């Protein structure tokens, strides 16, 4: 796909690494290993594979450079109860973001991460419906925000000149549980 984009447009300037899946919240010993493996494959390997392909293109194009924006999660900062695989996957994305920032520097490739909390998407339907597990064992409906706020934040990150970078940005529903999660 990267080659097709570069052929059509002459280069690749931005990658928004946005693939991700989650799982039903439960203690780790109750989770299916195949489901955990699938989550890691999508959330971690998906980011690696896309970043690798785009990095190569950005490194070899003239003028050299570009921007990679990884979709993290507030779970990369503060875990949600029963979400060990998802939390671990988003910590891996944070590690990738930091490494790409360093590795990309000589090639004018900037890398940043947006950590999103409770944007209203298909993935967060339960938050405003039946609720999600809380640290105290209860279920609670959590506030969500319009996904357009995420879109405008990503657009801001993407529109900066390569001499500037938003390394990490957190955009979340203002009233969502965050510190101490639940």
Question: Which residues does each predicted region cover?
Answer:
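Active-site loop immediately N-terminal to the catalytic Tyr-X3-Lys motif
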Residues: 78-84, 142
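Active-site helix of classical SDR
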Residues: 51, 89
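Residue(s) in the substrate-gating loop at a strand-loop-helix junction
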Residues: 73
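Alpha-helical segment proximal to the catalytic Tyr-Lys
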Residues: 56, 102-105
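C-terminal helical subdomain
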Residues: 113-114, 133-180
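Substrate-binding pocket helix/loop in short-chain dehydrogenase/reductase
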Residues: 26-28, 35-38
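Conserved amphipathic alpha-helix within the SDR
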Residues: 1-10
């Amino acid at each position: 796909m990267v080659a097709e984009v570069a052929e059509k447009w002459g280069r690749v300037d931005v990658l928004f690494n946005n693939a991700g899946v989650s799982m039903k919240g439960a203690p780790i010993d109750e989770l299916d290993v195949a489901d955990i493996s699938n989550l890691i494959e999508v959330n971690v390997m998906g980011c690696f594979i896309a970043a690798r392909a785009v990095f190569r293109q950005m490194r070899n194009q003239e003028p050299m450079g570009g921007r990679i924006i990884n979709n993290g999660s507030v779970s990369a900062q503060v875990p949600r109860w029963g979400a060990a695989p998802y939390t671990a996957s988003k910590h891996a994305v944070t590690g990738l973001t930091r490494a790409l920032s360093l590795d990309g520097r000589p090639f004018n490739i900037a890398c940043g991460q947006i950590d999103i909390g409770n944007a209203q998407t298909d993935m967060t339907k339960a938050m405003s419906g039946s609720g999600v597990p809380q640290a105290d064992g209860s279920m609670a409906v959590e506030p969500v925000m319009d996904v357009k706020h995420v879109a405008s934040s990503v657009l801001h990150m993407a529109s900066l000149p390569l001499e500037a970078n938003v390394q990490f940005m957190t955009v979340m529903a203002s009233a969502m549980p965050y510190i101490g999660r639940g």
